[in-house]
Amino acid sequence: MTLALQQTLKEAHLTPQEIDLVAVTQGPGLVGSLLVGINAANVFAYTYKKPLLGVNHLLGHIYSAQIEHEIKFPALVLLVSGGHTDLFYLTDHLQIKPLGTTIDDAVGEVYDKIAKNLNLPYPGGPLIDQLAQQGKDTYHLVRPYLKNDNLNFSFSGLKSTLVNLVMKQNLKDINIPDLCASFQTSVINVLCEKTKRALTKYHVKQLIVVGGVASNSGLRQKFMTSFSNLEVIFPSLQYCTDQAAMIGIAAYYQNQITKASKKYDLTAKPNLFF
């Protein structure tokens, strides 16, 4: 971490003394990974007597849209990543209402699991997306968890169906592009349908899609065409996956409401939500 901090300051042409605020991801996530960043932030902020702020990782993803666009309130946010599949309603900065979440597996997690069973290298999401563009929806897989009136998601059944299908057949007998296309079509249709349901309940000025899976070309195309009557915001690909810029911009807005302190005892919150 020391080398990373030194390199970052060098590329930014800044000295530690010129930093105004130190922000670090406090959760959710794996506690070991969180502690690496938190311990480094505690020490850095203490050494240079800078205010310190712990930031919700999910808030960072939401504010990744603000890096290149101006969020217009109220807004609906779909966060899709390896660890999360959530719908949020935003009425103002840091005024966030959770509407729905996954009750089991997150979308990105399922992508990686299917890719592993197809012997595709990690990370599997981009490769499945590429293969899906070459295939057709010939398997007609179930659109899971739509026979209800809530805004939650469930992808464990779809994952199990695909894993069992691959296990029962020889990989060489499977049309992998068609299977990827069928899987991706199922997932995207579910995300689209749940988003449509949310929009019938909440009036918004923007629809924002963030998280690692927001880089998926099929998802981007589907949402841009399905919600053409609404301003749809996707971050650039570099801001979809985890990066420091989103934590920095989230901290900027968070600090305007909850001022950072000069207490250097931040701890990890692996189950942090809203």
UniProtKB/Swiss-Prot annotation:
Keywords: Acyltransferase, Cytoplasm, Iron, Metal-binding, Transferase, tRNA processing. InterPro entries: ATPase_NBD, Gcp-like_dom, KAE1/TsaD, TsaD. It is found in: Cytoplasm. The keyword tRNA processing applies. SUPFAM superfamilies: Actin-like ATPase domain. Fe cation binds at residues 57, 61, 242. GO terms for cellular component: cytoplasm. Its EC number is 2.3.1.234. GO terms for biological process: tRNA threonylcarbamoyladenosine modification. Disulfide bonds: none annotated. Its main location: cytoplasm. It holds the Pfam family TsaD. Belongs to the KAE1 / TsaD family. This is tRNA N6-adenosine threonylcarbamoyltransferase. It comes from Aster yellows witches'-broom phytoplasma (strain AYWB). The gene is tsaD.
